[in-house]
Protein backbone atom coordinates (compact mmCIF):
# COMPACT_ATOMS: atom_id res chain seq x y z
CA UNK A 1 0.00 0.00 0.00
CA UNK A 2 1.37 3.38 -0.98
CA UNK A 3 1.08 6.45 1.19
CA UNK A 4 -1.90 8.40 -0.12
CA UNK A 5 -0.17 11.76 0.13
CA UNK A 6 2.66 10.39 -2.01
CA UNK A 7 0.11 9.39 -4.64
CA UNK A 8 -1.49 12.84 -4.56
CA UNK A 9 1.93 14.45 -4.96
CA UNK A 10 2.52 12.25 -8.01
CA UNK A 11 -0.75 13.48 -9.51
CA UNK A 12 -0.02 17.14 -8.76
CA UNK A 13 3.31 16.75 -10.58
CA UNK A 14 1.53 15.36 -13.63
CA UNK A 15 2.79 11.81 -13.12
CA UNK A 16 0.49 8.87 -13.89
CA UNK A 17 -0.56 6.34 -11.26
CA UNK A 18 -0.57 2.57 -11.75
CA UNK A 19 -3.86 0.70 -11.93
CA UNK A 20 -3.37 -0.57 -8.37
CA UNK A 21 -2.51 2.90 -7.02
CA UNK A 22 -5.61 4.39 -8.63
CA UNK A 23 -7.76 1.64 -7.13
CA UNK A 24 -6.35 2.57 -3.72
CA UNK A 25 -7.22 6.26 -4.23
CA UNK A 26 -10.78 5.49 -5.30
CA UNK A 27 -11.31 2.99 -2.49
CA UNK A 28 -10.58 5.87 -0.12
CA UNK A 29 -13.22 8.02 -1.85
CA UNK A 30 -16.00 5.44 -1.69
CA UNK A 31 -15.23 4.65 1.94
CA UNK A 32 -15.88 8.32 2.70
CA UNK A 33 -12.32 8.85 3.95
CA UNK A 34 -11.17 11.62 1.59
CA UNK A 35 -11.55 15.32 2.38
CA UNK A 36 -13.59 17.25 -0.23
CA UNK A 37 -10.74 19.68 -0.99
CA UNK A 38 -8.32 16.80 -1.52
CA UNK A 39 -10.81 15.01 -3.76
CA UNK A 40 -11.37 18.14 -5.83
CA UNK A 41 -7.63 18.66 -6.27
CA UNK A 42 -7.12 15.05 -7.29
CA UNK A 43 -9.98 15.07 -9.82
CA UNK A 44 -8.81 18.33 -11.39
CA UNK A 45 -5.18 17.15 -11.56
CA UNK A 46 -6.32 14.03 -13.40
CA UNK A 47 -8.50 16.03 -15.76
CA UNK A 48 -5.78 18.55 -16.63
CA UNK A 49 -3.26 15.83 -17.52
CA UNK A 50 -5.79 13.41 -19.01
CA UNK A 51 -6.53 10.05 -17.42
CA UNK A 52 -4.58 7.01 -18.61
CA UNK A 53 -6.16 3.66 -19.49
CA UNK A 54 -4.64 2.13 -16.32
CA UNK A 55 -6.02 4.95 -14.17
CA UNK A 56 -9.55 4.59 -15.51
CA UNK A 57 -9.37 0.80 -15.12
CA UNK A 58 -8.06 1.15 -11.56
CA UNK A 59 -10.84 3.53 -10.54
CA UNK A 60 -13.38 1.13 -12.08
CA UNK A 61 -11.76 -1.79 -10.21
CA UNK A 62 -12.32 -0.03 -6.88
CA UNK A 63 -15.96 0.77 -7.61
CA UNK A 64 -16.73 -2.69 -8.96
CA UNK A 65 -15.11 -4.37 -5.97
CA UNK A 66 -17.13 -2.26 -3.52
CA UNK A 67 -20.46 -2.74 -5.34
CA UNK A 68 -23.33 -4.75 -3.95
CA UNK A 69 -22.94 -8.21 -5.55
CA UNK A 70 -25.17 -9.22 -8.45
CA UNK A 71 -25.74 -13.00 -8.67
CA UNK A 72 -25.22 -14.46 -12.16
CA UNK A 73 -26.82 -17.79 -13.05
CA UNK A 74 -24.84 -20.43 -14.93
CA UNK A 75 -27.13 -19.86 -17.92
CA UNK A 76 -26.33 -16.15 -18.08
CA UNK A 77 -22.61 -16.87 -17.74
CA UNK A 78 -22.84 -19.32 -20.63
CA UNK A 79 -24.80 -17.02 -22.95
CA UNK A 80 -23.08 -13.81 -21.88
CA UNK A 81 -24.92 -10.56 -21.23
CA UNK A 82 -24.80 -7.16 -22.89
CA UNK A 83 -25.21 -3.60 -21.66
CA UNK A 84 -26.28 -0.71 -23.88
CA UNK A 85 -25.15 2.46 -22.16
CA UNK A 86 -23.86 5.97 -22.71
CA UNK A 87 -21.76 8.34 -20.67
CA UNK A 88 -24.39 11.05 -21.10
CA UNK A 89 -23.28 14.63 -21.31
CA UNK A 90 -23.61 14.93 -25.08
CA UNK A 91 -25.72 18.07 -24.72
CA UNK A 92 -28.62 16.83 -26.84
CA UNK A 93 -31.90 16.13 -25.10
CA UNK A 94 -32.89 13.21 -27.30
CA UNK A 95 -35.45 10.52 -26.61
CA UNK A 96 -34.15 7.60 -24.50
CA UNK A 97 -32.61 5.66 -27.35
CA UNK A 98 -30.32 3.24 -25.49
CA UNK A 99 -32.94 2.37 -22.86
CA UNK A 100 -35.57 1.70 -25.51
CA UNK A 101 -33.03 -0.30 -27.53
CA UNK A 102 -32.41 -2.51 -24.49
CA UNK A 103 -36.00 -3.80 -24.66
CA UNK A 104 -35.66 -4.46 -28.39
CA UNK A 105 -32.35 -6.31 -28.09
CA UNK A 106 -33.76 -8.47 -25.28
CA UNK A 107 -36.96 -9.21 -27.21
CA UNK A 108 -34.76 -10.24 -30.15
CA UNK A 109 -32.83 -12.78 -28.08
CA UNK A 110 -29.99 -10.99 -26.28
CA UNK A 111 -29.57 -11.11 -22.50
CA UNK A 112 -29.46 -7.45 -21.41
CA UNK A 113 -28.46 -6.12 -17.99
CA UNK A 114 -28.75 -2.36 -18.28
CA UNK A 115 -26.99 -0.29 -15.66
CA UNK A 116 -28.46 3.18 -15.35
CA UNK A 117 -29.05 6.21 -13.21
CA UNK A 118 -31.25 9.24 -12.91
CA UNK A 119 -30.39 12.07 -15.25
CA UNK A 120 -27.49 14.35 -14.45
CA UNK A 121 -27.14 16.36 -17.63
CA UNK A 122 -30.31 15.74 -19.64
CA UNK A 123 -34.00 16.00 -18.85
CA UNK A 124 -34.54 12.27 -18.70
CA UNK A 125 -32.09 9.53 -17.70
CA UNK A 126 -32.82 5.83 -18.08
CA UNK A 127 -34.09 5.47 -14.53
CA UNK A 128 -36.38 8.51 -14.87
CA UNK A 129 -37.94 6.89 -17.95
CA UNK A 130 -38.32 3.45 -16.37
CA UNK A 131 -40.12 4.86 -13.34
CA UNK A 132 -42.70 6.40 -15.67
CA UNK A 133 -43.12 3.04 -17.41
CA UNK A 134 -44.04 1.41 -14.10
CA UNK A 135 -40.72 -0.36 -13.56
CA UNK A 136 -39.52 -0.39 -9.95
CA UNK A 137 -35.89 0.68 -9.68
CA UNK A 138 -34.97 -0.99 -6.41
CA UNK A 139 -35.42 -4.66 -7.22
CA UNK A 140 -33.47 -6.99 -4.97
CA UNK A 141 -30.41 -8.36 -6.82
CA UNK A 142 -31.80 -11.93 -6.72
CA UNK A 143 -35.09 -10.77 -8.26
CA UNK A 144 -33.26 -8.79 -10.96
CA UNK A 145 -31.14 -11.85 -11.78
CA UNK A 146 -34.31 -13.93 -12.15
CA UNK A 147 -35.73 -11.32 -14.55
CA UNK A 148 -32.54 -11.58 -16.58
CA UNK A 149 -32.95 -15.35 -16.86
CA UNK A 150 -36.72 -15.45 -17.45
CA UNK A 151 -37.30 -12.29 -19.49
CA UNK A 152 -33.84 -11.67 -20.92
CA UNK A 153 -33.66 -8.20 -19.37
CA UNK A 154 -33.05 -6.45 -16.09
CA UNK A 155 -32.27 -2.90 -15.05
CA UNK A 156 -29.75 -2.20 -12.30
CA UNK A 157 -30.17 1.18 -10.61
CA UNK A 158 -26.65 2.48 -9.98
CA UNK A 159 -27.17 4.03 -6.49
CA UNK A 160 -28.71 0.74 -5.32
CA UNK A 161 -25.42 -1.05 -6.02
CA UNK A 162 -22.84 1.72 -5.62
CA UNK A 163 -23.62 3.40 -2.30
CA UNK A 164 -20.08 4.76 -1.81
CA UNK A 165 -20.19 6.98 -4.88
CA UNK A 166 -22.44 9.38 -2.93
CA UNK A 167 -19.34 10.68 -1.14
CA UNK A 168 -18.15 12.26 -4.41
CA UNK A 169 -21.45 13.93 -5.33
CA UNK A 170 -20.95 17.28 -3.51
CA UNK A 171 -17.46 17.71 -5.00
CA UNK A 172 -18.63 16.81 -8.50
CA UNK A 173 -21.48 19.30 -8.22
CA UNK A 174 -19.18 22.03 -6.93
CA UNK A 175 -16.61 21.50 -9.70
CA UNK A 176 -19.22 21.89 -12.47
CA UNK A 177 -16.92 20.22 -15.00
CA UNK A 178 -16.48 16.74 -16.39
CA UNK A 179 -14.21 14.46 -14.40
CA UNK A 180 -13.22 10.80 -14.52
CA UNK A 181 -16.58 10.02 -12.88
CA UNK A 182 -18.32 10.89 -16.16
CA UNK A 183 -16.78 7.86 -17.84
CA UNK A 184 -16.88 5.51 -14.84
CA UNK A 185 -20.66 5.02 -14.75
CA UNK A 186 -20.82 2.76 -17.82
CA UNK A 187 -17.77 0.78 -16.65
CA UNK A 188 -19.10 -0.38 -13.28
CA UNK A 189 -22.16 -2.47 -14.15
CA UNK A 190 -22.38 -4.90 -11.18
CA UNK A 191 -23.43 -7.71 -13.55
CA UNK A 192 -20.01 -7.50 -15.29
CA UNK A 193 -21.37 -7.88 -18.84
CA UNK A 194 -19.24 -9.72 -21.38
CA UNK A 195 -20.50 -7.50 -24.21
CA UNK A 196 -21.00 -3.74 -24.33
CA UNK A 197 -22.35 -1.07 -26.66
CA UNK A 198 -20.99 2.05 -24.99
CA UNK A 199 -21.56 5.60 -26.23
CA UNK A 200 -19.18 8.41 -25.29
CA UNK A 201 -19.49 12.21 -25.43
CA UNK A 202 -16.33 12.90 -27.46
CA UNK A 203 -14.48 11.20 -30.32
CA UNK A 204 -11.20 11.24 -28.37
CA UNK A 205 -12.56 8.68 -25.90
CA UNK A 206 -13.56 5.84 -28.22
CA UNK A 207 -10.19 4.07 -28.43
CA UNK A 208 -9.09 4.59 -24.79
CA UNK A 209 -12.44 3.38 -23.45
CA UNK A 210 -12.33 0.32 -25.72
CA UNK A 211 -8.88 -0.44 -24.25
CA UNK A 212 -10.25 0.06 -20.73
CA UNK A 213 -13.07 -2.42 -21.46
CA UNK A 214 -10.45 -4.94 -22.62
CA UNK A 215 -8.49 -4.37 -19.39
CA UNK A 216 -11.69 -4.95 -17.38
CA UNK A 217 -12.32 -8.31 -19.08
CA UNK A 218 -15.07 -7.38 -21.54
CA UNK A 219 -14.97 -9.81 -24.48
CA UNK A 220 -16.62 -7.80 -27.25
CA UNK A 221 -17.61 -4.15 -27.42
CA UNK A 222 -18.41 -1.25 -29.68
CA UNK A 223 -17.49 2.13 -28.22
CA UNK A 224 -19.30 4.73 -30.30
CA UNK A 225 -19.44 8.47 -30.86
CA UNK A 226 -22.32 9.44 -33.12
CA UNK A 227 -21.35 12.86 -34.47
CA UNK A 228 -22.33 14.67 -31.28
CA UNK A 229 -24.35 11.87 -29.67
CA UNK A 230 -23.25 9.23 -27.18
CA UNK A 231 -24.91 6.52 -29.29
CA UNK A 232 -25.11 5.20 -32.83
CA UNK A 233 -26.29 8.15 -34.93
CA UNK A 234 -29.15 8.43 -37.40
CA UNK A 235 -28.25 11.97 -38.52
CA UNK A 236 -24.62 11.41 -39.55
CA UNK A 237 -21.68 9.01 -39.33
CA UNK A 238 -20.83 7.10 -36.16
CA UNK A 239 -17.18 6.61 -35.18
CA UNK A 240 -16.61 3.14 -33.75
CA UNK A 241 -13.83 1.48 -31.77
CA UNK A 242 -14.68 -2.22 -31.84
CA UNK A 243 -13.10 -4.66 -29.39
CA UNK A 244 -12.97 -8.26 -30.63
CA UNK A 245 -10.50 -11.03 -29.78
CA UNK A 246 -8.45 -8.60 -27.71
CA UNK A 247 -7.89 -6.24 -30.64
CA UNK A 248 -9.40 -2.76 -31.10
CA UNK A 249 -10.11 -1.53 -34.63
CA UNK A 250 -11.68 1.77 -35.59
CA UNK A 251 -14.04 2.57 -38.43
CA UNK A 252 -17.10 4.63 -39.30
CA UNK A 253 -20.71 3.60 -39.92
CA UNK A 254 -23.24 5.70 -41.82
CA UNK A 255 -27.01 5.26 -41.37
CA UNK A 256 -27.05 3.88 -44.92
CA UNK A 257 -24.40 1.29 -43.96
CA UNK A 258 -26.84 0.10 -41.31
CA UNK A 259 -29.73 -0.10 -43.76
CA UNK A 260 -31.81 2.91 -42.68
CA UNK A 261 -32.45 6.41 -43.98
CA UNK A 262 -30.72 9.27 -42.19
CA UNK A 263 -32.87 11.81 -40.38
CA UNK A 264 -32.21 15.20 -38.85
CA UNK A 265 -31.23 15.13 -35.19
CA UNK A 266 -34.12 17.50 -34.41
CA UNK A 267 -36.49 14.60 -35.12
CA UNK A 268 -35.07 12.81 -32.07
CA UNK A 269 -35.65 15.61 -29.56
CA UNK A 270 -37.14 14.29 -26.35
CA UNK A 271 -38.97 15.90 -23.48
CA UNK A 272 -39.70 15.29 -19.83
CA UNK A 273 -39.60 11.70 -18.53
CA UNK A 274 -43.38 11.35 -18.86
CA UNK A 275 -43.20 12.44 -22.51
CA UNK A 276 -40.30 10.13 -23.24
CA UNK A 277 -42.11 7.21 -21.59
CA UNK A 278 -45.03 7.64 -24.01
CA UNK A 279 -42.58 7.85 -26.93
CA UNK A 280 -40.80 4.67 -25.81
CA UNK A 281 -44.10 2.81 -25.42
CA UNK A 282 -45.19 3.87 -28.92
CA UNK A 283 -41.85 2.75 -30.42
CA UNK A 284 -42.02 -0.63 -28.68
CA UNK A 285 -45.58 -1.18 -29.93
CA UNK A 286 -44.39 -0.65 -33.49
CA UNK A 287 -46.21 2.70 -33.66
CA UNK A 288 -43.24 5.04 -33.32
CA UNK A 289 -42.25 7.75 -35.76
CA UNK A 290 -39.91 6.41 -38.50
CA UNK A 291 -36.90 8.36 -37.16
CA UNK A 292 -37.56 7.12 -33.62
CA UNK A 293 -37.95 3.54 -34.82
CA UNK A 294 -34.77 3.63 -36.90
CA UNK A 295 -32.65 5.30 -34.21
CA UNK A 296 -33.62 2.60 -31.72
CA UNK A 297 -33.18 -0.19 -34.29
CA UNK A 298 -29.61 0.73 -35.25
CA UNK A 299 -28.55 0.80 -31.60
CA UNK A 300 -30.34 -2.45 -30.76
CA UNK A 301 -28.86 -3.91 -33.95
CA UNK A 302 -25.30 -3.12 -32.89
CA UNK A 303 -26.00 -4.71 -29.49
CA UNK A 304 -27.32 -7.84 -31.22
CA UNK A 305 -24.14 -7.95 -33.29
CA UNK A 306 -21.67 -7.65 -30.42
CA UNK A 307 -23.59 -10.16 -28.30
CA UNK A 308 -23.31 -12.72 -31.11
CA UNK A 309 -27.01 -12.96 -31.94
CA UNK A 310 -26.34 -11.60 -35.45
CA UNK A 311 -23.29 -11.82 -37.69
CA UNK A 312 -23.32 -8.16 -38.76
CA UNK A 313 -24.66 -4.79 -37.67
CA UNK A 314 -26.84 -4.79 -40.78
CA UNK A 315 -28.45 -8.12 -39.85
CA UNK A 316 -28.85 -6.87 -36.29
CA UNK A 317 -30.65 -3.75 -37.47
CA UNK A 318 -33.02 -5.80 -39.65
CA UNK A 319 -33.81 -8.13 -36.74
CA UNK A 320 -34.41 -5.11 -34.49
CA UNK A 321 -36.79 -3.57 -37.05
CA UNK A 322 -38.72 -6.85 -37.33
CA UNK A 323 -38.88 -7.11 -33.53
CA UNK A 324 -40.27 -3.57 -33.28
CA UNK A 325 -42.90 -4.30 -35.93
CA UNK A 326 -44.01 -7.40 -34.01
CA UNK A 327 -44.73 -5.56 -30.75
CA UNK A 328 -42.97 -8.23 -28.66
CA UNK A 329 -40.69 -5.60 -27.12
CA UNK A 330 -43.73 -3.85 -25.63
CA UNK A 331 -44.94 -7.13 -24.13
CA UNK A 332 -41.51 -7.41 -22.52
CA UNK A 333 -41.88 -3.93 -21.01
CA UNK A 334 -45.22 -4.83 -19.39
CA UNK A 335 -43.86 -8.18 -18.17
CA UNK A 336 -40.81 -6.51 -16.64
CA UNK A 337 -42.95 -3.85 -14.95
CA UNK A 338 -45.06 -6.55 -13.28
CA UNK A 339 -42.01 -8.58 -12.25
CA UNK A 340 -40.20 -5.53 -10.90
CA UNK A 341 -43.13 -4.48 -8.74
CA UNK A 342 -43.24 -7.98 -7.27
CA UNK A 343 -39.49 -8.02 -6.69
CA UNK A 344 -39.10 -4.52 -5.27
CA UNK A 345 -36.63 -4.28 -2.44
CA UNK A 346 -37.29 -1.52 0.04
CA UNK A 347 -34.31 -0.32 2.03
UniProtKB/Swiss-Prot annotation:
The keyword Amino-acid biosynthesis applies. One of its GO terms (molecular function) is magnesium ion binding. Its cofactor is Mg(2+). Pfam families: Glycos_trans_3N (PF02885), Glycos_transf_3 (PF00591). 5-phospho-alpha-D-ribose 1-diphosphate binds at residues 86, 89-90, 94, 96-99, 114-122, 126. Pathway: Amino-acid biosynthesis; L-tryptophan biosynthesis; L-tryptophan from chorismate: step 2/5. Anthranilate 2 binds at residue 172. It comes from the Bacteria. This is Anthranilate phosphoribosyltransferase. It comes from Shewanella frigidimarina (strain NCIMB 400). The gene is trpD.
Amino acid sequence: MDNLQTLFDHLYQGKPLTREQMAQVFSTIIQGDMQPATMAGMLVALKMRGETIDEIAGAADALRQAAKPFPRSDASKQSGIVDIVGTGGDGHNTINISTTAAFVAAAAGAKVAKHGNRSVSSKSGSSDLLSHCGIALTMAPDAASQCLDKLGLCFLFAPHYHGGVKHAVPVRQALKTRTIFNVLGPLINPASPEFMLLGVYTLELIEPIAQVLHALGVKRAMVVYGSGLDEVALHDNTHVAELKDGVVRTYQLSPEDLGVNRADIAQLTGGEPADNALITQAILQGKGLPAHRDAVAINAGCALYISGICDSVQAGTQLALATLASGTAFTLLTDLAAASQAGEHNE
